[in-house]
């Protein structure tokens, strides 16, 4: 894969990664649906064990609470983003640190310094997030 193609893919992937949080600022459902693979084996591990998602249908159920007018995304920050595109140019993986904040019915919610990794696949010329994993560092065990 030529380096210019790789650079273009990395820029596109970075945009998709940012849009995977940014869509919520305007509740842009069309953008949300364009980002993720609508597969039965799509999965997401969130920091809490109760929110593990397997399959697009289960993931889409989260939209109900995300689209609720009482839920308001306030902002997000993605930093230390690393993207690697495979030699074939069909698969990519990433890692980053994320902050995400909002409020539901006036009560704040959010993530701070969450580690985020994921895998994307190029399908029909478009990159889709196929899996993602978010976790909080636990440095207590290393003391």
Place the predicted regions along the sequence by residue.
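Short, low-complexity N-terminal intrinsically disordered segments enriched in polar/charged residues
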Residues: 1-38, 143
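Short, well-ordered beta-strand segments in beta-rich or mixed alpha/beta enzyme
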Residues: 20, 43-47, 91-102
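Hydrophobic/aromatic beta-strand elements that line small-molecule binding cavities or substrate pockets
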Residues: 20, 59, 63, 78-84, ...
